[in-house]
């Protein structure tokens, strides 16, 4: 089997674009936001896959199957949503990924400018670098949560309980 792509490499592309002099600022910012989302989402999915692969429970096997399907984005958010109710420190991780996902969806599919973003109460102008910075900050929250996520995944009985609630 070949070498695995590191999803955090998407951040290099985001940073390259941030520093570039491309004059299509809105397109550039929309692309940067997407790279931060995918770096975050795939990073979290990788942690889940790596830490749950040796679980033999029906719930874990089903979850690992589901996070490979097209609705994996929702499944991982559902997992984090249940997790934050079990342990409040995961609220920031859930909120970060949720906002990033909503920004990414709007940046890819909402062509109006400013655009409506599900979890953000105001209309979003993707010409504004604020939303790039917001995406970068949400990405950092997720990456910095790695040890907390890995630690909770070691508690098999708690994880099976969480997975049953999804």
Curated annotation (Swiss-Prot):
It comes from the Archaea. To M.jannaschii MJ0992. This is Uncharacterized protein MJ0628. It comes from Methanocaldococcus jannaschii (strain ATCC 43067 / DSM 2661 / JAL-1 / JCM 10045 / NBRC 100440).
